[in-house]
Amino acid sequence: MEIVGCRAENNSCPFRPPAMLFHGISGGHIQGIMEEMERRSKTEARLTKGTQLNGRDAGMPPLSPEKPALCAGCGGKISDRYYLLAVDKQWHLRCLKCCECKLALESELTCFAKDGSIYCKEDYYRRFSVQRCARCHLGISASEMVMRARDSVYHLSCFTCSTCNKTLTTGDHFGMKDSLVYCRAHFETLLQGEYPPQLSYTELAAKSGGLALPYFNGTGTVQKGRPRKRKSPALGVDIVNYNSGCNENEADHLDRDQQPYPPSQKTKRMRTSFKHHQLRTMKSYFAINHNPDAKDLKQLAQKTGLTKRVLQVWFQNARAKFRRNLLRQENGGVDKADGTSLPAPPSADSGALTPPGTATTLTDLTNPTVTVVTTVTSNMDSHEPGSPSQTTLTNLF
């Protein structure tokens, strides 16, 4: 049986299926198929009407036809079917961008707003979620190396003197005033009232509560002790003064200034004492070699427990005293300080150590009653015609 069409009931859907040809199907089955097709067409019509509203998706907020929405980015009307809603504002898909890197945020999961500006995640955390450099006021990421001074943090390139822009590194001395960093030279000038012109030394002292401002080093802590001094005629103070009046029964000392800044401030002294066995070891070696090298200083440091710097200073002052006493001996023949005869310096040809074949005797140099007699070879006598064959080292120190 061939069916070309079917008759529609009154008040039924105006759907008209095209002419179809059915073979081997009874009339009852054909009628059921047509009714099912009409039911499905009505359901699809209701879904289409519910999902379309003014030509837009129902999931988006409805736009009033009287007052169309304006894009918060470009300010134009939104006539697209899809738009974005961020911080209670409507945006074109192409207009929601990061204000820093211009990255389109339509496909991003998150965006951030600050003072009316839109940021992506990276720029927001870079600018607002980390500490800022005290010099350039830009963000510092967690992976960057920084310099710290008091409560401030600086980029490595921003930690410079506010006057000469000299880059300050770890270990350099610097001063701070009103969150400004100065190198040592300009900070000393600032203390003396010569720089800057609008800030006098009296005002600086009144603001800081004293006449001196602290120094800092590159580690970000206040320099409590005396910083290592550079040779400057303005300071006029020796780094280390050897106590030349010491004897065997008194410990030697190294005098150091505590704080030389400013010059008008009263200085404090920190004294380094030597024990008797340390003095004996140093004096015994001084009798052999007046100028020990780095290897000898290392061995002496292990024996005495002193630092190489302290040993260098002691030998430096001992050589100076030896030369001074030698000049006194040449002029008067007798050291006026203790009234004892002094030995001549070792010959340059003899080397640092006693030559082979020379009988050398080292005893306790701290005992004033024992003398050390050294027999000098004939070549040394020819090089030093005025030097005696016997020298007394007991009262040298």
Curated annotation (Swiss-Prot):
Domain of life: Eukaryota
Tissue expression summary: Expressed in the dorsal thalamus and inner nuclei of the cerebellum.
Name of the coding gene: Lhx9
Region (Disordered): 248-272, 330-365, 378-397
Keywords, sorted A to Z: DNA-binding, Homeobox, LIM domain, Metal-binding, Nucleus, Repeat, Zinc
Protein name per Swiss-Prot or TrEMBL: LIM/homeobox protein Lhx9
Cell cycle found in the keyword field: no
GO biological process, one term: negative regulation of DNA-templated transcription
One Gene Ontology cellular component annotation held by this UniProt entry: nucleus
Pfam families xref list: Homeodomain, LIM
Function: Involved in gonadal development.
Subcellular location(s) per record: Nucleus
Protein source organism: Mus musculus
